[in-house]
Amino acid sequence: FFTVRDILQRYRAEDVRYFILASHYRSPLNYSQENLEHGKAALTRLYTALRGIEPAAAGGDAGDAWVTAFNAAMDDDFNTPEAIAVLFELAREINRQRDSDPGRARALVTCLLALGSTLGLLQSDPDAYLREGGDPDAISEADIETLIENRLQAREEKNWAEADRIRDELEAAGVVLEDGPAGTTWRRS
């Protein structure tokens, strides 16, 4: 037995919303922690595509094909699983365009945010979503930042064993590090 309050102590409301929308409204909804974790992981993939790209001021026609596909899914007996599949196709295209055509990527981000908002998804700041864990016992942001600084110091000193140990410690605490040209970013797994 569980209550919505119990679920919301462990998962964000948006994770639960995604979990519900991922099933067609005429189909039975199979509640399980595993299915909620799948929903949380799926939202993490969408937010990861949005991370680091500001939306364009005006979307233009860059996302027209996805808007058409999304609307067709919604017009097909409110087929939210198919509409969500369109969001993932759009996220994949954003990831492909991220470096090669940043202007198009920004326009596609605008489209993804608009389509996601239709379903009540993708309403949070991507960095904030990816840094929140939902687990009250999780390692704090301050501790994560301190460990990242220690890791960067170890890397500067070419102390690879220490840098790897810190990465492993963060990974064990449910934190994923992403090293890039702009520095190290992190998100909760």
Regions found by a protein language model. Give the residues of each.
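Structural preference for alpha-helix termini/caps and helix-kink/transition segments
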Residues: 1-189
